[in-house]
Structures are given as structure tokens and as C-alpha cells.
């Protein structure tokens, strides 16, 4: 693997840095306090091409490789994880699933809107009673002539309040476990689908997170993505790449924590000198720096494997596991450097810690990642 970036990748990274500086950084505190990112950011993300990364230009995408995608999601994560999540879900989980599994009609209907920011997508997998055990969904899709009628509910759905389309997973057959799960593309204006915004989150407060309720939601059979019974495969393939995106966002959080800690330590004075002169402060900062580099390299390795068409799912779990835990450590250490000021939301490190904490939970908890890695190493499933 070449650890250097191409001119194109360097340019994309700089484009993302400039975008964060111009469109995100000035608003982060206000969005966090209001629990509401300005939705106009979606269109801006589309205009700059970030919602079309790795998607063929034929369908409105901006092309590029997965390392470029990781560079962008890292920078967005450095700026505001609530905004990064918009891209990771609408592009990473929804648009990329349509590109991989959809037929021509589905690609042409949904991809141009998703890549431009005209549409927002959400990923309807998690349920009130089903998180890690994603193969045991209770949402049902029953065939009725040329349609399916869907009943159930989904919980903690990123982009759920804003979404124009849900990539929805429901049990459509009586086959056991995950074999009975199918995937559907459901427009959110379909009769019977209602949404409730979830407020009071610890972190990602600006993100539009929702609970979805489906009562006799009728969709045509043509809304099914991939063959019947392949929904779990759609979900797992999406999450394998999604974990790479989350890992990249976590690198961004950790990098932001490092930048903040260094800046504060070299300015704040105690005992007649800047606190950077104190050995234990340098220890905190050096620990963050090592975590940043290690997490970034693990993430880049996944992107390299994806771009070369090699198996990557286990490496993606490793990257997500390490990077998410590293982001929590980094933000916590940065807060320690700040002392009491770090506990006030006028300073960035408290939000970094709040945002980092959920990264160890969604798209597979740290414990689930360890089971995935352990299964790959031993050949024994502990699920």
C-alpha cells in the first residue's frame, strides 16, 4: 500500500478542509445547542460532490475512490460529526447500497437525487427491541397482490426526520432468522409512515434522528431492493463499508481533539509557564497523537482493500473498533488538558467527547466488532 496521497486525493482533502472551515465551523456550537443542523447543508454537500463520492457519474455521482471518501468523512468528522453522519448514511449506507444491489430503474430513480442533495436517505434497520441482533426483526412485509404491506417500527434512525427515502428492512417470509429479511426502498411520503424526532441525545445533537412508525404502509413489489430474502446481505454489506466511514469520522474527532489540546496547552499558563511544559500534559497529548495515527492507518488500509477488490469486512471491524474507542480516549484526554474550561460548550472538546461516545455503539457496538474479529480468527461464531 502506498501511504502517500495522489494529487487528486490531496485536492479532495483540501476541498473538504475548506468546506468545513467555511460552511460548518462557524455554526457548530449553535447547531449543537439548538439540536438542529441547518438543512441547507445537505444541498451544499451535494453541490461540492461529497454526496456522490464513489458513485458512477452516469447516475449523478462524482466518482473517486474509497480513500478519497475516507479523507472527506475524516474532515467532516473533524468539523461536526452530526454533518458527517448525513453523508455516511445517505451516501454510505443508502446510495451505495442502491448502486450495488439496485436494478437500473431503482438506480435512475434514486441515485441522481441522493448524490445531488435533492434527496436524503436513511437506513431503517434498528428497531425498538432489536439492535445488535439484526437478524430478528419484527417489522413485517406481507405480500398482497402486486404490493407489500409493511407494519412495524424503527428506532434511532439517522436522517430519519429529513429523509425522502428509507432503505427499510423487514421480514417478508417465514424463513428462520436473517433468511426471511428483505430490503425495500420506501418513499417517506407513503401513506402510513410517520416520524417522530428524538430529542435529548447526549451527542450528535444536531443530527436529525427519528423513530419511524409504519402502519399498513403499501409499496409495490418493485420497491424491493435485491431478491427476496437477501435483505440481511444488503444490510451487512452496507455496514461493512459503513464501519470504514465511521472509523474515518472517528479519526476526524481524534484529530480535532489533538489540534485543540495542542493549541490550548501552548497558550494556557500555570505556574509561570505554559502547561505544555508539564510532562503529564505532554503525555496526554502524545497519547492522543498515537491514537490518531494508528486509527488513520487502520482506516486507510480498509479503503485500500475495498479499492483493490479484496476482502475487507474483518479489517473494517478492526478499524471501527479501534478508531471509535480511540476517539473517546482522545476527546477525554483533550478535555483533561483543558481542565474546567473543557466542560463548557464554548470550547470544542466537550462536544467531541459527547459525539465520540456513540461511535462505540452504532453500526455495531465495540463488543459486536470483537465477535466479528474473533469469528474470523477462530472460525467459531460466538453470536
Describe the predicted segments one by one:
Residues 122, 136-140, 147, 165-169, ...:
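Conserved hydrophobic/aromatic beta-strand scaffold that supports enzyme active sites
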Residues 1-83, 89, 101-106, 113-118, ...:
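Alpha-helical interface subdomain recognition
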Residues 117-125:
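A short, Trp-centered hydrophobic/proline-enriched beta-strand micro-motif
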Residues 87, 114, 129-132, 156-159, ...:
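Short Gly/Pro-enriched turn/cap motifs at secondary-structure boundaries
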Residues 136, 189-218:
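Flexible, small-/acidic-enriched active-site or ligand-binding loops
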Residues 146-147, 151-195:
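A short core secondary-structure module
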Residues 95-101, 123:
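Flexible, glycine-rich active-site loops centered on histidine and acidic residues
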Residues 64-65, 133-135, 159-163, 177-180, ...:
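Short glycine/proline-enriched turns and hinge-like loops at secondary-structure junctions
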Amino acid at each position: 500500500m502506498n501511504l502517500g496521497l495522489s494529487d487528486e486525493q490531496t485536492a479532495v482533502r483540501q476541498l473538504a478542509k475548506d468546506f468545513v472551515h467555511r460552511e460548518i465551523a462557524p455554526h457548530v456550537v449553535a447547531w449543537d445547542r439548538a439540536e438542529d443542523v441547518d438543512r441547507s447543508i445537505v444541498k451544499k454537500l451535494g453541490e461540492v460532490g461529497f454526496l456522490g463520492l464513489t458513485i458512477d457519474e452516469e447516475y449523478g455521482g462524482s466518482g473517486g475512490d474509497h480513500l478519497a471518501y475516507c479523507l472527506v468523512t475524516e474532515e467532516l468528522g473533524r468539523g461536526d460529526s452530526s454533518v458527517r453522519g448525513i453523508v455516511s448514511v445517505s451516501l454510505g449506507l443508502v446510495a451505495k447500497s442502491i448502486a450495488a444491489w439496485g436494478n437500473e430503474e431503482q438506480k435512475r430513480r434514486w441515485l441522481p437525487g441522493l448524490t445531488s442533495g435533492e434527496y436524503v436517505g436513511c437506513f431503517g434497520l434498528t428497531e425498538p427491541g432489536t439492535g445488535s441482533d439484526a437478524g430478528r426483526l419484527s417489522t413485517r412485509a406481507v405480500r398482497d397482490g402486486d404490493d407489500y404491506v409493511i407494519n412495524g417500527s424503527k428506532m434511532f434512525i439517522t436522517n430519519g426526520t429529513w429523509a425522502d427515502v428509507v432503505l427499510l428492512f423487514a421480514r417478508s417470509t417465514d424463513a428462520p432468522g436473517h433468511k426471511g429479511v428483505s430490503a425495500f426502498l420506501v418513499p417517506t411520503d407513503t401513506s402510513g409512515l410517520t416520524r417522530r424526532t428524538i430529542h435529548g441525545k447526549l451527542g450528535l445533537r444536531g443530527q436529525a434522528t427519528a423513530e419511524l412508525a409504519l402502519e399498513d404502509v403499501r409499496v409495490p413489489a418493485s420497491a424491493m431492493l435485491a431478491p427476496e430474502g437477501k435483505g440481511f446481505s444488503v444490510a451487512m454489506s452496507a455496514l461493512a463499508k459503513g464501519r470504514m466511514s465511521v472509523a474515518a469520522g472517528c479519526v476526524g474527532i481524534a484529530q480535532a481533539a489533538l489540534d485543540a489540546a495542542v493549541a490550548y496547552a501552548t497558550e494556557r499558563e500555570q505556574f509561570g509557564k505554559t502547561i505544555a511544559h508539564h510532562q503529564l500534559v505532554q503525555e496526554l497529548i502524545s497519547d492522543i497523537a498515537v491514537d490518531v495515527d494508528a486509527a488513520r492507518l487502520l482506516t486507510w488500509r480498509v479503503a485500500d482493500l475495498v479499492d483493490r477488490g479484496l476482502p475487507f469486512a474483518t479489517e473494517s471491524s478492526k478499524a471501527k473498533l479501534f478508531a471509535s474507542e480511540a476517539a473517546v480516549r482522545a476527546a477525554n484526554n483533550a478535555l483533561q488538558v483543558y481542565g474546567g474550561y473543557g466542560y463548557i460548550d464554548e470550547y470544542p472538546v466537550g462536544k467531541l467527547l459527547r459525539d465520540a461516545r456513540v461511535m462505540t455503539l452504532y453500526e455495531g457496538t465495540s463488543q459486536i466488532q470483537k465477535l466479528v474479529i474473533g469469528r474470523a480468527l477462530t472460525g467459531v461464531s460466538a453470536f
